[in-house]
Amino acid sequence: MHQIFDYENASEQNPQLYKIISEYKGKPVVGGGCKTSIHLHHEGIEELTTLLKWIGGLVPLVSHRYSNPSNDKFSHIDYLPPSDYGGGKYNFNIDAFKLVHCWGVTYDKGDGVEKHNHYPYALSFCYYVNLPEGSSPLVLDNDVIYPKEGQVIFFLSNT
């Protein structure tokens, strides 16, 4: 299962983000492409910080949807009082998620990603900055997703 959200500032931010990722890229990845450091979020890049603040603001809703099989409407109040041991109606701290790693990857035609997961982390996301025509889809547990520029896709990290 995945969750998709559209970033309303993508048309303004994405060209800058693409330039930044292109300048920081360095290490080749298995399957092709180059990626930045996994600590790109610590570089003090204003555009990235703005994007990650928006993504971080979605995490409570995303985690609620993953943890709530009955599809109850999200309300932050249902998670109060928060604690390290949970809290509220659903018995977990919705504000306990932390961004551990963040990187950018660029791919050329013919490059791709080998099947992998991000275990032992709980949530992962991909944000799409630039998708030329013919770009490969994202495949999660045999679910083929055709993202659009400016979309963030959340998924469980063990996927």
Per-region residue spans from a language model:
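Non-heme Fe(II)/2-oxoglutarate
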Residues: M1-I94
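Catalytic core of non-heme Fe(II) oxygenases with the double-stranded beta-helix
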Residues: G87-T159
